[in-house]
Design a protein with these regions (language model features):
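Internal/C-terminal transmembrane anchor helices
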Residues: 63-92
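Second-shell loop/turn segments in exported
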Residues: 142-149, 211-221
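Short beta-strand segments that buttress and anchor functional surface loops
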Residues: 180-185
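A conserved amphipathic terminal alpha-helix motif
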Residues: 217-239
């Protein structure tokens, strides 16, 4: 039993690595690598169960199967694959299945350049009432940022903060007060599109942000977290 456990765990690693690499290198759409990762996670999870059962059975029969050191190594190797998957499932259950978030649901910023760099198979950028309603309930604290700076000064701060966060700026329109950028997630390399809009308001400026994932049904809260982090960094830059 422990032999099968070790084989499954060893097989899981190349499956996951190749799946991640194929997507990051843009060799195929995200669905196939995602299924491959799920397969790797399943193999690792079964490996953990068989490993534990094998060790318990060996101890009960008084027969040595694997040394404790080797067993720990296999367990850690499998846990590294399984743990993120468990965390993802837990996070996914706690947030709505949406992937387009904005600080202004009444009048969301409209992408101008991003549609030209998206694939036809990517998520739509049309926001319907159902998505807006789910966002209001899930992220009631998401709001615009009011600055005392002029529109030109705010644009400099907005662009500098976006660059500091590692975003790739793909459009900067001083006259319209808009900046579009692309952010990439660490592990899978998913690309999310962001637009920052600056409008004059009450003697200063109002900054709104919209972040939308190109693929997937749920963003697992990533877009809302990105917007909050950006707004916090922007506010800190002003002080």
């Amino acid at each position: 039993m422990t032999l099968w456990a070790s084989r499954l765990i060893v097989c899981a690693w190349p499956i996951v690595i190749l799946a991640l690499a194929s997507f990051r290198l843009d060799l195929m759409s995200f669905k196939v690598p995602l299924l491959a990762v799920a397969l790797g996670v399943l193999l690792a999870a079964i490996g953990i169960v068989l490993l534990i059962l094998g060790l318990l059975l060996g101890a009960f029969k008084g027969q040595a199967t694997l040394s404790s050191g080797v067993a720990v190594i296999y367990f850690i190797a499998a846990f590294i694959i399984v743990a993120p998957a468990i965390q993802t499932i837990m996070v996914g259950a706690s947030v709505p299945p949406i992937h387009d978030i904005t600080t202004d649901p009444d009048d969301p910023p409209i992408f101008a350049h991003v549609p030209s760099i998206r694939k036809a198979s990517d998520n739509s950028l049309e926001l319907d009432a159902g998505v807006i309603d789910q966002q209001r309930k899930a992220y009631p604290d998401l709001a615009a940022l009011i600055l005392s700076q002029s529109k030109a000064e705010a644009m400099i701060l907005v662009a500098d903060t976006a660059t500091a966060m590692g975003w790739e700026i793909v459009r900067r329109d001083e006259e319209q007060g808009q900046l579009e950028a692309v952010a990439q997630t660490m592990i899978f390399g998913f690309k999310d599109d962001i637009i920052v809009r600056i409008r004059e308001a009450d003697g200063g400026t109002r900054v709104d942000v919209r972040s939308a994932s190109r693929v997937g049904v749920s963003d697992l809260g990533a877009n809302a977290a990105r917007i909050k982090a950006y707004m916090a960094a922007l506010q800190e830059a002003v002080q």
